[in-house]
Amino acid sequence: MLLFTLCFFADQENGGKALASPPGNWQKADVTFDSNTAFESLVVSPDKKTVENVGVPKGVPDSPERFSSSPCVLGSPGFRSGKHFFEVKYGTQREWAVGLAGKSVKRKGYLRLVPEERIWQKGLWWLRRLETDSDKLQKGSGKIIVFLDYDEGKVIFDLDGEVTTIQANFNGEEVVPFYYIGARVSLANL
């Protein structure tokens, strides 16, 4: 799937011509969840590879890094240049989003998951009951791959073969993996 996706990107960027190998030097990032940023109902596994929204506040201390009103968590490492990608496994639940956020993303108060808030994301939502979303849920768990071409200002999502590209202006800011995890949802970095 990854090779197909990278070749698809190459085809799009190369005027419709297929390439024999993946474009550029995409680096797979070994992403972990940053428990210091996790909303109070999110439980990060000891190896920092899985996160679950248990729906009940854990009584963790507040800090400037922690999301206070939205069930979100950031990941690491962060990126300031280059081409990187990471993969996330999701289950049959809906109400999650995966992507990237500026390191300075707002942590306190209501958070809108939009580029104006320094968040570039893709996910499955209860409020957007698209036929394709229902099809994904019936198949069970799946995978989303997030590609970042920092220097070109592109975030590319491959959600089980459905490719979406978002143009982004990072303004030189470090960007980090971003996750929104709804009630009773779990996600795993691969």
Curated annotation (Swiss-Prot):
Annotated localization: Secreted
InterPro entries, sorted: B30.2/SPRY (IPR001870), B30.2/SPRY_sf (IPR043136), Butyrophylin_SPRY (IPR003879), ConA-like_dom_sf (IPR013320), PRY (IPR006574), SPRY_dom (IPR003877), TRIM/RBCC (IPR050143)
Domain of life: Eukaryota
SS bond partners: none
Domain B30.2/SPRY residue range list: 21-127
Tissue specificity note: Expressed by the venom gland.
UniProt KW keywords: Neurotoxin, Secreted, Signal, Toxin
SUPFAM superfamilies the record matches: Concanavalin A-like lectins/glucanases
Main location as per UniProt: secreted
Matching PANTHER family: E3 UBIQUITIN-PROTEIN LIGASE TRIM
Protein family membership: Belongs to the ohanin/vespryn family.
Function as written in the Swiss-Prot or TrEMBL entry: Neurotoxin that produces dose-dependent hypolocomotion and hyperalgesia in mice. May directly act on the central nervous system, as it is 6500-fold more potent when administered intracerebroventricularly than intraperitoneal.
Name of the protein in question: Ohanin
